[in-house]
């Protein structure tokens, strides 16, 4: 998708949606269950059959489920997605949600915050490149200068490359989906405890199966990201500090020191969509 002329507006979800979509679909589970679980590209997706098309009601109804889903996935940001012209809604990781086909799905809710977004700004290098509507000696009011500073921290998403999962993480996501389906009332803590005990008691053959999946995922990851180095995500406090800084800039005018530099700031992004094309998990032999 060509995003060179895209102008991100509205919410952070809208921004990420423009850059990440690569026309993925989610299989439909045709049954009467309110909640069903689907494996999509090695990730668990929760399907919900709603009573009506009220997105606000659906988000409210799925709030607890979305929170537990995030805990099951190491605290990753999540999204609630609506399949257009249907009563089907999905809880997915944020990364997967923004890879879905925008002609089929709408992202109606995310847990992403402005603190997860990184400002990247490109300024025009010389006065000759300044647009004519901003002549060199044009007066600039403190109010308009403040708006320019707010634009200078215009949010653009930074692609987050996930680490390849180890054998236990793959097992945990698979087993958690089965437990949720059979016991929808279980808490995330109870599920984590059950999964840990189950993994400890699994046979070497079962563990070898998931080890093979992890090795294959690691191989695909190295091919897709040859220069990848793991970097810890921002802590909650770091995100809160960044948000406070952006909020402070938006509230106070900045003195004008060089009118030549007062011009619209354009955000740029080097984001590319990466698809590992992971093989579908062959778990048929484990379905007892």
UniProtKB/Swiss-Prot annotation:
Keyword Nucleus: yes
DNA bind region: 161-229
Primary location class: nucleus
CDD domains (UniProt xref): HMG-box_ROX1-like
Keywords: DNA-binding, Fertilization, Nucleus, Transcription
Gene Ontology terms: cellular component: nucleus
Coiled-coil positions: none
GO BP: cell differentiation; negative regulation of transcription by RNA polymerase II; single fertilization
Record-given protein name: Sporulation minus regulator 2
Species assigned in the record: Podospora anserina (Pleurage anserina)
Taxonomic lineage from the root: Eukaryota, Fungi, Dikarya, Ascomycota, Pezizomycotina
């Amino acid at each position: 998708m060509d995003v060179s002329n895209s102008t991100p507006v509205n919410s952070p979800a809208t921004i990420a949606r423009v850059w990440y979509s690569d026309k993925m679909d989610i299989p439909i589970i045709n049954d009467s269950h309110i909640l069903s679980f689907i494996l999509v590209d090695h990730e668990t997706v929760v399907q919900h059959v709603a009573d009506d098309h009220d997105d606000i009601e659906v988000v409210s109804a799925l709030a607890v489920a979305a929170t537990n889903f995030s805990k099951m996935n190491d605290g990753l940001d999540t999204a609630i997605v609506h399949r257009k012209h249907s009563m089907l809604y999905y809880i997915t990781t944020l990364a997967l949600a923004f890879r879905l086909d925008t002609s089929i799905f709408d992202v109606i809710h995310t847990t992403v915050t402005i603190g997860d977004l990184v400002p990247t700004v490109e300024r025009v290098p010389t006065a000759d490149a300044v647009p004519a509507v901003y002549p060199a000696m044009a007066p600039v009011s403190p109010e308009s200068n403040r708006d320019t500073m707010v634009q200078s921290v215009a949010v653009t998403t930074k692609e987050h490359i996930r680490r390849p999962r180890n054998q236990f993480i793959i097992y945990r996501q698979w087993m958690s989906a089965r437990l949720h389906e059979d016991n929808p009332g279980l808490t995330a803590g109870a599920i984590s405890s059950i999964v840990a005990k189950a993994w400890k008691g699994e046979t070497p053959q079962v563990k070898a199966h998931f080890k093979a999946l992890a090795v294959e995922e690691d191989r695909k990851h190295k091919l897709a990201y040859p220069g990848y180095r793991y970097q810890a995500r921002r802590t909650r406090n770091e995100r809160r500090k960044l948000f406070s800084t952006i909020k402070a800039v938006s509230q106070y005018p900045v003195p004008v020191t060089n009118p030549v530099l007062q011009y619209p700031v354009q955000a740029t992004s080097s984001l590319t969509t990466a698809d590992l094309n992971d093989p579908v998990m062959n778990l048929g032999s484990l379905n007892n």
